[in-house]
Amino acid sequence: MTFKDLFSVQSASYAKFRPDYPPALYAWLASQTPGHAQAWDCGTGNGQCAVHLAGFYENVYATDPSAQQIAHAAPHDRVRYAVEPAENCGLPDASADLVTVGQALHWFRFEDYFREVARVLRPGGSSPHGRTACRRFHRRSTRWYFSCTKARSAVTGCRKTA
């Protein structure tokens, strides 16, 4: 399967305008691992998640198959960027305490990617992918937002649809 780079043309705009995740997410991710030596942010894009993870991990290895995305990634002393596919990372075996993916998992070849995650995760490491982890975080961190949105909709007469 050949990588089709759909993000190079607008990589500067993507880096400038992509919304960020709440700071509580990064603290929660860090709380899921006993060690904090190495994180791998796969499909890093502009490095947004990688830079935040650098506040919790000594080293962050941030990869993306798009050279243009990496070229526009935010620099940080603890983040090392590499142009690599998700399915073939340059980290050694059992070297990562945490593996994250922001909004890129749907682009990956799942079987090959999860095999790579299993290879690079050290014992006790965490890779909180999937709906369960997202749902748990979402419930805890955004409940107040949706409560406020419902209240605001009731006051203004607008109806929010999902």
Where does each model-flagged region fall?
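Class I SAM-dependent methyltransferase SAM/SAH-binding core
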Residues: 40, 46-88
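A short acidic, Gly/Pro-enriched loop at the edge of an enzyme's catalytic core
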Residues: 87-98
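A short, conserved alpha-helix within the catalytic core of class I
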Residues: 108-116
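Class I SAM-dependent methyltransferase Rossmann-like catalytic core
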Residues: 6-19
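Conserved catalytic/acceptor-binding region of the Class I
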Residues: 118, 122-162
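Conserved alpha-helix/loop element of class I SAM-dependent methyltransferases that forms part
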Residues: 19-37
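A short beta-strand submotif of the Rossmann-like class I SAM-dependent methyltransferase core
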Residues: 101-102, 110
